C-alpha cells in the first residue's frame, strides 16, 4: 500500500491538482510487484486521502490530489510495509515520481507453513510436479525422483522412459545438456530440485527434439535477503554415498549462487542369461551367471550471478562444471552345452572406464520494454563442452585362469555446441499475447576409436586397424517460431508454428559413406484449455516432433560386449517424426486433493529399433535401423487425496496399446502389446514423523525381436525433523522385498536368448539435511499464508 499525509490541510488551491505515480519492485530480483496497495495519507492524522492498487507491471497512479504534503504507505502480503515521508505536491512541482521503489520480502517473524503445495499443477502445455515436499528424496539423485513422477518410468537398470519412450529432451532450468539424459540426471542431487515439469506435448516455443516430449528440472533458489545454505549428506549400502552444499547470497539487486556436490551411485545386480542356438537337429545351449554393475561417481561445482539494476533490465551468468566417471563391469561364468551335455566352461570379465568432463555456461539478458515484465525481449547464449576418455576391456578366461581371448577398445573425443536464442513477448488486449523467437545452434564432436585384440603369444593387445576409425560429426540446427495465445471467457488457447533447418555431415577414416542432411522441417502445435465448474479443467493439445539419432548411433566401430555379442552403428539412419495428440481432464476436490485423466495417441514414423543378426558363426551383431511405424494409444490417470489429516495417498496408472509395423530386408517385425504401469504412494504424518510407502508395478512390452519382463518394487521412507525443520534425518529402503527385476527374451534367426537381472536388495540409505535461512516455505504470523 502507499499512503500520503499533509503538513497542512489540502485544498488551499482547489483548482490545481497534483499526481503521485511510480512503480513498485522487489528489492532482490527487481521484479514488478502487482496488486500492492498504495495509499496517500494525511501526515497529521494518518487518514487516507487516496489509494490505488499496482498493475501487473507494478505501476500505480494517484491522480487529482490536492496540493500539499503527503505520507506514502506501501504494503502487500509477504513484504515489509514501507513509508515515504514528506512527499510534496506544489504549484512548482505538480507531480512526484516514485521510480523503481523497492520493497523487501519479510525475513523476521516467520513461521513454517503447515500446508504443502499441490503434488501436481496443470498448465495449458505442461504438468508441474512438486518435488521439495517429497520425503524420500534426501540423498538420492534426480533418477530416483523420477520414479515417483507421473508419465515417467525408471527401469531396474536405471533406464528412463516417458510414456514408454526413451526419446525425450532433458532441460535443467530450461537449459539443454550435452550429456546423455540418464547420466545428467544421475549427477543432480534430488535435494536441489524444486519442481519437475513434464511436457508431453511441447509447444512451438520448445525445441522440436524428443519423441515423447520434454522433462525440465527446476532447481531450488533462495528467496530472501542475506545468506542461505543447504547441506545434505547421505550414505548407504553397496558403496552409495553423496554430499552437496548450496550457498545463496542476496543483497539489494544482486544474487550470488554457488554449489558443490560429490556422489557415488552403485546398484549391483545378479544376471542370468541362457542362449539357445539350433543347427538342424543339434541344440547348443550357453548359460551365463554372474554379477554386473553400472556405478557412477560425480564431482562438480557451479555458480551464478544475477543483477537487476532496475525494473527494465535483468542480467544472469551461470556456469556448471562436472567430472563424471562411469565404471560398468560384468563378471560372468559360462557353461556350454550340446544336446544337454556339458562341453566347456569359462569365465568372461568386462571392465569399462569412462571419464567425462562437462561444462555448461550460459548468459541471459532480458529487457522489459517500458518497465513492463510482460512486454520484453530476451537474449540467451549457451555453451556446452564435453570431453570423454573411454577404455573398454573384455577378457575371457579358461578354467585354469589362462586368457583364452580378449579385446580392448578405446575412444577419445571432445564435443561442443554453441546456442543463441532471441525471444520477444508482446502483450495484447483482452488477455492475448504474441511471442516469437529465433535460435541458432552449432554442434560438433569427434571420436577416435581404436580396437585391440589380445595376442596369446606375446600376452599383449595388438592394434586392429580394421575395427578402428576416426569420426567427425557436425550438426547445426537453426530455428524460428511464432506463437499466439489468449483467453476468451473460459476458453484458453495457444497456437504455434516452428521451423527448424538441420545441416548434418559425418566424415570418417573408415570405408563408410554417410548421408548428408540438409533440410527444413515444420512443427505446428496447438493447445486449448477450458475451465469448468469447481475449478475443473479440460485440456486438448497437438504437436509434431522429431527425434534425431544421437552421434553414437552412427559409429562405425565394432565393440565387443562378450565373446558372443558385438555392436556397431548405422551410417544411414534417418530421424523419427512424431505426431502426438492429448486430451486431459483435471478435477480438484477442494482442499482434499485432485484427480486427472489423460487420453493420448502418438505415431512415430521411421521408428528406430536395435536389430540383431548373425555376424559370424556363433556371434551376433546389434545395429540400429529405421524399421517402420510405431503407434501408441493410451489412458493415464492420477489421484491425490487426503483420506485423513495424517494419511494421504497419491496414485497413478498408465495403460497403452502399442503397435509396431516394421519390415527390414524382407523380415516382418510387426508386433503388438498392451502395456500398463501403476504406482501408489501412502504418506503418514504423526508426532513430527513422516512415513511413506511407495509401491510400483510396470508390465513388460514387446520389441522388434522379443519382449521385456514386468517388475514390481516397494520402497519405504521414514523422516524426522528437528530444530524447527532446519535439520531432517531420513532413513530409506528401496526394493525392500527384493522383487524388482529387468529381463527380456529375444529371437534372431536360429538364436533364442533369455535374460533376467535382479538388483541386490534391499538398498538402504541414511540421509541428513541441514537448512539455514530460507530453503523452506515461510509466512508472516499476522498475515494470510502465502507460498512466495
Where does each model-flagged region fall?
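Surface-exposed extracellular loop regions of Gram-negative outer-membrane beta-barrel proteins
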Residues: 213, 217-231, 298-303, 324, 387, 503-505, 534-580, 601-622, ...
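Outer membrane beta-barrel strand-and-loop segments of large Gram-negative receptors
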Residues: 289, 417-421, 462-469, 570, ...
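Short acidic/polar hinge/loop motifs at secondary-structure boundaries
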Residues: 63, 142, 148, 175-200
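N-terminal periplasmic accessory domains that precede
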Residues: 100, 142-145, 160, 183-184, ...
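Short, acidic, small-residue-rich periplasmic hinge/interaction motif at the N-terminus
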Residues: 9-12, 25, 29, 37-41, ...
Amino acid at each position: 500500500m502507499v499512503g500520503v499525509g499533509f503538513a497542512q490541510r489540502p485544498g488551499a488551491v482547489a483548482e490545481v491538482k497534483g499526481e503521485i505515480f511510480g512503480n513498485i519492485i522487489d528489492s532482490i530480483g527487481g521484479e514488478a510487484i502487482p496488486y500492492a496497495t498504495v495509499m496517500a495519507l494525511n501526515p497529521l492524522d494518518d487518514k487516507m486521502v487516496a489509494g490505488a492498487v499496482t498493475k501487473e507491471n507494478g505501476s500505480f497512479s494517484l491522480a487529482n490530489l490536492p496540493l500539499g504534503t503527503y505520507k506514502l504507505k506501501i504494503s502487500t502480503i509477504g513484504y515489509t510495509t514501507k513509508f515515504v515521508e514528506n512527499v510534496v505536491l506544489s504549484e512548482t512541482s505538480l507531480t512526484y515520481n516514485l521510480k523503481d521503489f523497492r520493497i523487501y520480502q519479510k525475513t523476521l517473524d516467520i513461521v513454517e507453513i503447515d500446508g504443502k503445495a499441490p503434488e501436481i499443477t496443470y498448465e495449458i502445455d505442461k504438468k508441474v510436479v512438486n518435488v521439495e515436499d517429497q520425503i524420500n528424496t534426501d540423498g538420492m539423485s534426480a533418477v530416483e525422483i523420477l520414479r515417483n513422477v507421473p508419465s515417467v518410468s525408471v527401469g531396474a537398470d536405471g533406464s528412463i522412459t516417458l510414456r514408454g519412450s526413451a526419446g525425450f529432451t532433458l532441460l535443467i532450468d530450461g537449459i539443454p545438456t550435452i550429456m546423455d539424459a540418464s547420466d545428467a540426471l544421475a549427477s543432480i542431487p534430488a535435494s536441489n530440485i524444486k519442481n519437475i515439469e513434464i511436457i508431453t506435448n511441447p509447444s512451438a516455443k520448445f525445441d522440436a527434439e524428443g519423441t515423447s516430449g520434454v522433462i525440465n528440472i527446476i532447481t531450488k533458489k533462495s528467496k530472501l535477503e542475506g545468506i542461505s545454505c543447504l547441506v545434505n549428506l547421505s550414505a548407504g549400502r553397496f558403496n552409495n554415498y553423496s554430499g552437496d552444499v548450496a550457498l545463496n547470497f542476496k543483497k539489494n539487486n544482486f544474487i550470488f549462487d554457488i554449489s558443490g556436490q560429490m556422489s557415488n551411485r552403485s546398484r549391483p545386480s545378479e544376471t542370468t542369461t541362457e542362449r539357445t542356438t539350433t543347427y538342424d537337429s543339434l541344440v547348443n545351449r550357453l548359460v551365463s551367471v554372474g554379477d554386473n554393475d553400472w556405478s557412477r561417481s560425480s564431482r562438480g561445482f557451479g555458480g551464478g550471478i544475477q543483477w537487476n539494476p532496475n525494473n527494465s533490465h535483468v542480467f544472469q551468468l551461470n556456469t556448471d562444471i562436472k567430472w563424471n566417471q562411469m565404471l560398468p563391469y560384468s563378471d560372468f561364468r559360462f557353461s556350454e552345452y550340446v544336446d544337454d551335455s556339458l562341453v566347456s566352461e569359462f569365465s568372461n570379465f568386462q571392465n569399462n572406464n569412462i571419464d567425462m568432463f562437462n561444462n555448461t555456461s550460459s548468459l541471459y539478458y532480458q529487457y522489459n520494454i517500458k518497465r513492463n515484465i510482460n512486454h520484453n525481449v530476451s537474449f540467451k547464449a549457451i555453451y556446452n563442452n564435453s570431453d570423454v576418455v573411454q577404455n573398454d576391456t573384455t577378457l575371457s578366461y579358461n578354467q585354469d585362469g589362462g586368457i583364452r581371448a580378449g579385446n580392448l577398445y578405446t575412444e577419445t573425443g571432445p564435443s561442443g555446441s554453441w546456442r543463441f536464442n532471441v525471444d520477444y513477448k508482446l502483450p495484447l488486449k483482452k488477455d492475448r499475447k504474441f511471442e516469437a523467437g529465433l535460435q541458432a545452434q552449432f554442434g560438433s564432436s569427434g571420436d577416435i576409436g581404436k580396437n585391440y585384440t589380445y595376442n596369446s603369444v606375446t600376452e599383449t593387445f595388438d592394434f586392429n586397424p580394421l575395427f578402428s576409425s576416426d569420426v567427425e560429426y557436425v550438426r547445426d540446427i537453426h530455428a524460428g517460431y511464432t506463437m499466439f495465445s489468449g483467453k476468451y471467457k473460459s476458453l484458453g488457447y495457444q497456437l504455434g508454428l516452428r521451423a527448424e533447418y538441420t545441416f548434418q555431415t559425418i566424415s570418417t577414416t573408415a570405408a563408410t559413406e554417410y548421408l548428408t542432411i540438409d533440410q527444413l522441417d515444420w512443427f505446428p502445435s496447438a493447445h486449448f484449455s477450458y475451465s469448468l465448474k469447481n475449478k475443473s479443467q479440460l485440456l486438448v493439445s497437438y504437436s509434431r516432433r522429431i527425434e534425431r539419432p544421437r552421434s553414437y548411433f552412427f559409429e562405425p566401430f565394432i565393440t565387443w560386449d562378450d565373446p558372443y555379442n558385438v555392436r556397431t552403428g548405422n551410417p544411414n539412419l534417418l530421424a523419427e517424426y512424431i505426431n502426438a495428440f492429448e486430451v486431459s481432464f483435471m478435477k480438484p476436490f477442494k482442499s482434499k486433493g485432485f484427480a486427472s485423466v489423460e487420453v493420448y495417441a502418438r505415431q512415430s514414423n521411421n521408428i528406430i529399433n536395435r536389430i540383431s543378426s548373425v555376424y559370424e558363426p556363433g556371434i551376433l551383431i546389434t545395429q540400429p535401423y529405421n524399421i517402420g511405424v510405431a503407434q501408441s494409444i493410451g489412458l493415464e490417470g492420477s489421484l491425490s487425496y487426503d483420506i485423513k489429516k495424517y494419511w494421504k495417498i497419491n496414485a497413478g496408472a498408465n495403460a497403452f496399446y502399442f503397435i509396431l509395423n516394421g519390415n527390414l530386408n524382407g523380415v516382418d517385425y510387426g508386433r503388438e502389446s498392451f502395456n500398463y504401469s501403476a504406482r501408489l504412494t501412502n504418506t503418514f504424518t504423526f508426532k513430527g514423523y513422516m512415513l511413506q510407502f511407495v509401491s510400483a508395478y510396470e508390465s513388460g512390452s514387446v520389441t522388434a525381436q522379443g519382449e521385456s519382463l514386468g517388475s514390481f518394487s516397494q520402497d519405504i521412507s521414514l523422516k524426522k525433523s528437528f530444530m524447527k525443520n532446519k535439520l531432517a534425518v531420513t532413513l530409506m529402503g528401496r526394493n525392500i522385498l527384493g522383487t524388482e527385476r529387468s529381463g527380456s527374451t529375444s529371437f534372431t534367426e536360429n538364436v533364442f536368448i533369455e535374460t533376467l537381472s535382479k538388483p541386490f536388495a534391499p538398498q538402504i540409505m541414511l540421509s541428513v539435511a541441514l537448512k539455514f535461512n530460507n530453503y523452506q516455505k515461510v509466512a508472516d504470523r499476522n498475515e494470510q499464508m502465502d507460498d512466495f
